[in-house]
C-alpha cells in the first residue's frame, strides 16, 4: 500500500509539473476569450476605428520624425554594444539573452546535470586559472648584451618592454639578494644595482662591487697575521656582479661564457661556505638559499652558452648534472632546456624519457612539453602521411595517436601552429612568458621551429590537422576538452610582455556578434529611409505605395508559391511531369 501511495503521489506531482509547463497557453486562450466576451463593454470596435482614423491623419513629417528617432536609438544601442564588446569581449544583448532570458523561456544548460560534480572542483578550477594567468620566467631567454642589444643596434627596435624588464629586475632581487647583504659592501652595492633602471648604471655598479673586493684584499692582507692570510685569499669575489656583466655588458656569447666561469668560481665558494653554516640560524639559511639560486643560475647559463656555441653534448651533460644535483629547484624549468638540446642531437629516445618524467598530470604543462610530445608522435607517421590516402582508408592507430597529440598541444596553446607553419613572422622571445599565450608560442617556436623542419612531414601533418582542434572546443573560454578553459587574461598580459611592433595573436578570434551587425544594418537602413523621405516625401510615398501594391498583388503571391514549389522539386530531384500527347483519329 505504501508503494502504491508513493507511486500515486509521484504521478500527481509529474502531472502538476507538466500542467505548469503549458499553463501559459491556457492563460493565453483565457485572455482571448475574455476579450471576445467583453468586446462590447470595452468598445473595442470604436477604439480600433479611432486608432485607424488617427493613423490616417498622420503627416509624412511624423514618419520622418519616427524613423529619425528609431535610427538615433539604434545608433546609441550600436555604440553601447561596440563599447561593451571592446571592453568585455562579448555582446551585451547576447549575454543577457543567454544568461537571463533563456532560463525564463525554459532553456536548460547542458552542464546542469553535472552541477554537483563541478561545484566540488570550483576551487581547483580557480587555482588553475590563477596559475595559468601567472607570468613565468622564460627558460630559454636570450642574453641581453650578446643578443637583445645586438638586435637593437641592427634594427633600432627595442625587443623588450619595460614591463618585461621590470619583472626581470624583481626576479633578480628575489634570487640574488637576501637580508644580510648590507653586512658585505659588494653585496650591498649589487642589491641597489638590481633596482637600477638604467643599464649603464647597473654595469657601473657591478664594476664598483668587484673593485671593492680588490681594494679590501689589498688593504687587509698586510695588517693581519699569516694564519689569516690564507682565509682571505679564499674569500670569493662577488658572483652576482659577474652575472650582471655577463648578461648585459658582454657583446658575444664567448665573452659571456668567460664571465660566467669567473662567476662560477666565486659562487661555488660562497655556496660551500654557506652550506656549512646554514643550520646556525635563519639568517645563514636565507644566505644559503640565495647562494644556491646563484649557483644554479650560473650553471644553467653556462650550459646555455655551450648550447649556443655548438657544444651541445657538453650542454646536455651540464644540464643533467645540474638536475641531479638540485632536483627540487623546478622554478628554472631546466628540463625544457634539456629537451631542446636533446632534440638538436636528435636523441629522440632520451627526449621520450624526459617527457615520461615531466609530462605528468600532476605537473604544470607548457608548450614545450605538449608540442614535443606531439612531435614525437608525428615523427612515427609523418613521413608516410597523405591526407588523400587518409581520407580514403581512414586513419591508422599511430596516425590517430599523432593527431590526438597535435589536438592536445593546440588546445593548450593555439598560437604555436601559425609560427611553426610560418603563417606569422617571429620576433625575439621575451624574458617572461604567459603560459597558453602568444608570448609562450613565440618563445617555443623561436627555438623549436628547426626541430619540426628536421622531421620529414611533421609540418605537413600539423598543417592538415591542427584546425580540427577548434571543432572539439567551440566555446574555449567556457569549457575545454583536455585542459581547463582558455584564460581570458592572456591577451592583456601578452600586450604588456611583447613589443608594440608585434601584432599580438588573439584567441579565440573576436568576431562581431550578429546583434551588432544587425543593429548597424538597421540603423543605416532607417537613417537612409529618413533622409530620403525628408528630401523627397512625395516620391517616397509613391514608392512605398507601389511596393505595397506589389506585395499585396495576386501575381506576387502566385509567383512566390511557384518559386517555392520549384525549390522543393530541385532539392528532392522530382522529375517533371510528362506532357500528355493528343492523337488525332
UniProtKB/Swiss-Prot annotation:
Subcellular location: Membrane
Encoding gene (name): ST7
Alphabetic keyword roster: Glycoprotein, Membrane, Phosphoprotein, Transmembrane, Transmembrane helix
Domain of life (superkingdom): Eukaryota
Transmembrane feature ranges: 15-35, 62-82, 512-532
Positions bearing Phosphoserine: 386
Protein name: Suppressor of tumorigenicity 7 protein
Family annotation (InterPro entries): ST7 (IPR007311)
